[in-house]
Amino acid sequence: MADQLTDDQIAEFKEAFSLFDKDGDGCITTKELGTVMRSLGQNPTEAELQDMINEVDADGNGTIDFPEFLNLMARKMKDTDSEEELKEAFRVFDKDQNGFISAAELRHVMTNLGEKLTDEEVDEMIREADVDGDGQINYEEFVKVMMAK
């Protein structure tokens, strides 16, 4: 499954993995998964976190290592009912729920994920996605960016 990913995708997932893997030991624990999900405004129970880990924990050691994480991401990318997931992700970014992601909202979420971005980097991300040039990202633009990944 993971062998269908491009080098770019793998590099991107490695970066995402290291955001989860707070102590850098090469494994994501339920605690680390919970921390990241809470920073994204989710509030999973301990049981839900354990279920998520069990779903991809191929070797049964109770944590997710990078190959297991890659398999999860490859499966999620094949998941065609991702419309709901995209809407959910958009809502996480669109803090004031006005239908647009502003530079401030983007910076806020990225900071919560542990990504310290300069104003220039945030503006660049907005510019890349901002098809109609209004300085913010609407849902259609968001979907385009997410599907291009």
UniProtKB/Swiss-Prot annotation:
GO MF term set: calcium ion binding; enzyme regulator activity
Gene3D superfamilies: EF-hand
Modified residues (N-acetylalanine): 2
List of residues binding Ca(2+) 3: 94, 96, 98, 105
Top-level division of the source organism's lineage: Eukaryota
Keyword Acetylation: yes
Residues given in the record as Ca(2+) 2 binding sites: 57, 59, 61, 63, 68
Binding site for Ca(2+) 1: 21, 23, 25, 27, 32
An example Gene Ontology CC term for this record: cytoplasm
Sequence positions that bind Ca(2+) 4: 130, 132, 134, 136, 141
Every EF-hand domain range: 8-43, 44-79, 81-116, 117-149
Pfam annotation, one family: EF-hand_7
Keyword field: Acetylation, Calcium, Metal-binding, Methylation, Repeat
Modification N6,N6,N6-trimethyllysine, positions: 116
Miscellaneous comment: This protein has four functional calcium-binding sites.
Stated family: Belongs to the calmodulin family.
Function recorded in the entry: Calmodulin mediates the control of a large number of enzymes, ion channels and other proteins by Ca(2+). Among the enzymes to be stimulated by the calmodulin-Ca(2+) complex are a number of protein kinases and phosphatases.
Name recorded for this polypeptide: Calmodulin-2
